[in-house]
UniProtKB/Swiss-Prot annotation:
This is NADPH-dependent 3-dehydrocapnine reductase. The lineage of its organism: Bacteria, Pseudomonadati, Bacteroidota, Flavobacteriia, Flavobacteriales. The keyword Oxidoreductase applies. Reductase involved in the biosynthesis of capnine, a sulfonolipid present in the outer membrane of gliding Bacteroidetes and essential for gliding motility. Catalyzes the reduction of 3-dehydrocapnine to capnine. One of its GO terms (molecular function) is oxidoreductase activity. The active site is at Y153 (proton acceptor). SUPFAM superfamilies: NAD(P)-binding Rossmann-fold domains.
């Protein structure tokens, strides 16, 4: 039996990855914040799905979950950890509340790193281990290319990219692989949850722009790939003997890669500035 841990399986990318791994025969520990959010998997996979109820930022609860995992896995070890849980917020860096920025990092960065640290020994990060697992971190194309107004989310994903690059290189001494999955536009609920339902920046020079962001996000989601596309890449990374360091999952992938790695920063500045001007004209 191969064991996996997947965080944030109640919906979206996490749910799709959990479903994929279960369908392929893995025993999956899936984390949710409310037990009822795991009902779908508990009923469909009663023998191979194990519900873990915790908020990833609640470290004592995470510690208990790790103990729970260890009791089941024992000396067999984990095959893979998929860090998926995350939140998204947008707003102008000039005015975004520090607490909101901190929340992005608490969930998207620190909570992810904490769980990874606690599970690495079960993934074979030890000289005595007789197995080597994988860490799959769900990042974002926003972790490489930053759009205006997405600074809070994008900066947290930049941090994720750097930390897991470092971890990948450090864990080479154990043979434990670390992979980054970088989704672009995906039909998922994360941005729907990010919508404020108001305009906290209406009294700033960004008020008109922010007022149009929800519409802009809706337009991006229309061209988004299904969450199953990300799940497919996660599975590809898991089964690969020599997985890539990172996998981009986006419509028009070559265009995204060009924007991320080839187009000069100043040219991107002009492109994004035109987008901002367009938003003000639409308000």
């Amino acid at each position: 039996m191969r064991y996996a841990v997947v965080t944030g399986v109640s919906s979206g990318i996490g749910k799709a990855i959990c479903e994929k791994f279960l369908a392929k025969g893995l025993y999956v520990f899936g984390s949710v914040r409310k037990k009822e959010d795991a009902k779908y998997f508990e009923e469909k996979y009663p023998n191979t799905f194990h519900t873990l109820v915790f908020d990833t930022t609640d470290y004592p609860a995470v510690d208990k979950a790790v103990e729970e995992i260890h009791k089941v896995v024992g000396k067999k070890g984990l095959s893979v950890l998929v860090n998926n849980a995350g939140v998204a917020k947008y707003g102008p860096i000039q005015h975004v509340p520090i607490e909101e920025l901190r929340q992005q990092y608490e969930v998207n960065v620190f909570a992810s790193v904490y769980l990874t640290q606690k599970l690495l020994w079960l993934l074979g990060a030890s000289k005595e281990a007789k197995w080597q697992g994988k860490v799959i971190q769900i990042s974002s194309t926003a972790g490489v290319m930053t759009r205006p107004m997405l600074g809070p989310y994008s900066s947290s994903k930049h941090a994720v990219e750097a930390i897991y690059d470092a971890l990948r290189r450090e864990l080479m001494i154990y043979g434990v692989e670390v992979v980054l999955i970088e989704p672009g536009p995906i039909k998922t609920e994360i941005w729907g949850k990010a919508k404020s339902g108001g305009n906290p920046y209406k009294d700033t020079d960004y008020g008109e722009i922010f007022a149009q962001l929800d519409k802009a996000v809706d337009e991006i989601e229309k061209i988004g790939l299904p969450v199953e596309a990300v799940a497919g890449k996660a599975w590809e990374a898991f089964v690969a003997k020599k997985p890539k360091a990172r996998y981009v999952v986006a419509p028009k992938k070559l265009m995204f890669k060009a924007a991320m790695y080839l187009i000069p920063d100043r040219m991107l500045d002009k492109i994004f500035y035109k987008d901002l001007k367009k938003l003000t004209q639409e308000s």
